[in-house]
């Protein structure tokens, strides 16, 4: 299963998954993707 949470560090509209991933990395979450409404969502295995 994959756990998801909104990024606390990401600011602004999410256009590139790589930028989102960097923000999630700071939160010790290995993955991050842009989701609808231009938000950054961090993901990791549960």
From Swiss-Prot:
Under SUPFAM superfamilies, the record lists: Scorpion toxin-like (SSF57095)
Entries under SMART domains matching the protein: Knot1
Intrachain disulfide bonds: 3-46, 14-34, 20-40, 24-42
Listed A to Z, the keywords are: Antibiotic, Antimicrobial, Disulfide bond, Fungicide, Plant defense
Pfam family example for this protein? Gamma-thionin
Q: What InterPro entries does the record point to?
A: Defensin_plant (IPR008176), Scorpion_toxin-like (IPR003614), Scorpion_toxin-like_sf (IPR036574)
What does the entry state regarding organ or tissue expression?
Answer: Leaves and flowers.
Give me any GO biological process, just one. defense response to fungus
Q: Does the keyword Magnesium apply?
A: no
The UniProt family comment states:
Belongs to the DEFL family.
Purpose? Strong inhibiting activity against C.beticola and other filamentous fungi. Little or no effect against bacteria.
Name listed for the protein in its UniProt record: Defensin-like protein AX1
User: What is the originating organism of this protein?
Assistant: Beta vulgaris (Sugar beet)
């Amino acid at each position: 299963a994959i756990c998801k949470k909104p990024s606390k560090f990401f600011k602004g509209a999410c256009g590139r998954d790589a930028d989102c991933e960097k923000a999630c990395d700071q939160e010790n979450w290995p993955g991050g993707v842009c989701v609808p409404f231009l938000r950054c969502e961090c993901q990791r295995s549960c």
